[in-house]
């Protein structure tokens, strides 16, 4: 048996082997959430960070509204410090799928010269990501924002609802969230409030990768192992391909087979040594992994309880 599905690289309908029941159930839930939010809210937007979860989210959004266009814009908060491969991939996807892409950079951060090196990861993230996101959401007057967060990623995300309610200044109070009964979501909001909606809440990292494999979803190549230059700093392997990266005393550029489990700003994202060059290799590697994928993100450990503090202030 085969089912008719659209080719992720075009709008053509092709024969594709059916998903296994577990992935199909997750897909159905995510598509239901997309359609519920699109039907309930006046002005939704999808937060697009270009990583593997965003790629799956985009694929599901296209499925949810196929054969029409994705009926809401994609919002990318560009800090100016993303991997160059990410920006090239973002622009390619927007062109390929005829997406309404909104890109925002915090003008205050640009004027003040805020960088991960000059201001440290905590202040840099607050200005260039959290503050920038609040600016963009206010400018677009969006009342709902889709995000690709999953409950298995990190402790504070584990307690977040699928509909995560935010105050008029985009803050999150985990003690003041509404109950969710099965797949019944309450989208009623007060004036000025908004919702972050998370269609991938119940997916695991391995689910994401198996779905990418089953659906042939394109990804940024940094997720796959390749011989690359890097330096070791603060317990992380930092990619050394950007001329803005200045070596500290005692540091030297090394070369080795590395890849990334998660993608963010290059100075704050650590690689891992790996030989996983294919989807099968990546999945096999993850099935025996003993640490979280976000162990390689400096912003998750720059202060005690850092992710929850960031989310309370309006972070993704």
Curated annotation (Swiss-Prot):
Any single biological process term in GO: hydrogen sulfide biosynthetic process
Gene: cysD
Name this polypeptide is given: Sulfate adenylyltransferase subunit 2
GO MF annotation list: ATP binding; sulfate adenylyltransferase (ATP) activity
InterPro entries reported for this sequence: PAPS_reduct_dom, Rossmann-like_a/b/a_fold, SO4_adenylTrfase_ssu, Sulfate_adenylyltrnsfr_sub2
Species assigned in the record: Allorhizobium ampelinum (strain ATCC BAA-846 / DSM 112012 / S4)
Phylogenetic classification of the source organism: Bacteria, Pseudomonadati, Pseudomonadota, Alphaproteobacteria, Hyphomicrobiales
UniProt EC number: 2.7.7.4
Pfam families tied to this protein: PAPS_reduct
Biochemical pathway: Sulfur metabolism; hydrogen sulfide biosynthesis; sulfite from sulfate: step 1/3
Record-linked Gene3D superfamilies: HUPs
Coiled coil regions in record: none
Region spans: Disordered: 297-316
């Amino acid at each position: 048996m085969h089912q008719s599905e659209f080719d992720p690289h075009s709008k053509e309908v092709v024969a594709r082997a059916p998903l296994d029941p577990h992935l199909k159930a997750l897909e159905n839930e995510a598509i239901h959430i997309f359609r519920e939010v699109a039907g309930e809210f006046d002005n939704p937007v999808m937060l697009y960070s270009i990583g593997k979860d965003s790629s799956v989210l985009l694929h599901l959004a296209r499925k949810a509204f196929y054969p029409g266009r994705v009926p809401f814009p994609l919002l990318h908060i560009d800090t100016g410090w993303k991997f160059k491969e990410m920006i090239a991939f973002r622009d390619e996807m927007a062109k390929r799928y005829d997406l309404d892409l909104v890109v925002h950079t915090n003008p205050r951060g640009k004027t003040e010269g805020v960088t991960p090196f000059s201001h440290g990861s905590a202040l840099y993230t607050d200005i260039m990501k959290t503050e920038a996101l609040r600016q963009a959401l206010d400018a677009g007057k969006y009342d709902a924002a889709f995000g690709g967060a999953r409950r298995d990623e990190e402790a504070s995300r584990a307690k977040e609802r699928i509909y995560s309610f935010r105050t008029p200044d985009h803050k999150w109070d985990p003690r003041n969230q509404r109950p969710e009964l099965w797949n019944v979501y309450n989208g009623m909001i007060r004036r000025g409030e908004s919702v972050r909606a998370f269609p991938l809440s119940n997916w695991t990292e391995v689910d994401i990768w198996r779905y990418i494999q089953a659906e042939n979803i394109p990804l940024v190549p940094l997720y796959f192992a390749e011989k690359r230059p890097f330096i070791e700093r603060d317990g992380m392997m930092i990619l050394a391909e950007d001329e803005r990266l200045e070596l500290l005393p005692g540091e030297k550029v090394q070369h080795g087979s590395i890849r990334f489990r998660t993608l963010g700003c290059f100075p704050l994202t650590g690689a891992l040594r790996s030989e996983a060059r294919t989807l099968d290799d990546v999945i096999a590697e993850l099935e025996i992994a003993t640490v979280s994928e976000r162990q390689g993100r400096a912003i998750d450990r720059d202060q005690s309880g850092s992710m929850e503090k960031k989310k309370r202030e309006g972070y993704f």
